Amino acid sequence: MSFEGTIMSEYEVSLKDIRKTFGFVPGFMKPVPKDVLVKQWPLLKKYQMGESIIPQKYRELIGLAVAATLKCPYCTLMHTAMAKGYGATDEEISEAGYLTAQTANWSSMLHANRYDYPTFAKEVDMVGENAKKKAGKK
């Protein structure tokens, strides 16, 4: 079988799996080069929709935070819909947005004040140790 034939058959298998996963092949996947889709689909499926250490709802809330930071309307829409689909409430989505804003806010403050990074790293270690104590971990 030729390289082109192998890619086509792998591509057809990928499309079939995408249909099974989503119920259809989303239009945004159609312009993706066939050889790229064959390689990217298993990774997308595993880490975005499969079993993982991080529960699905929280992965989607993380994705939403990243999308909001990137100001990507496509990703924001997708991760909001997926988070809600996995049980996220409007309040959780709002809180994810707030946490995203807080990270950007404090990052701006630290950069604007040119806060000493080694000092910050030591302080963060102390904050982490304090959090462990409060959580009852050693």
Can you annotate each of these PLM segments?
Residues K45, G63, T80-K84:
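Amphipathic alpha-helical segments within well-ordered protein domains
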Residues I62, V66-M78:
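Short, thiol/selenol-centered motifs that function as redox-active sites or metal-ligating centers
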Residues M1-Y58, A112-K138:
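Acidic, glycine/proline-rich low-complexity segments that act as flexible tails and inter-domain linkers
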Residues E92-Y98:
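Beta-strand segments within the central parallel beta-sheet cores of soluble alpha/beta enzyme folds
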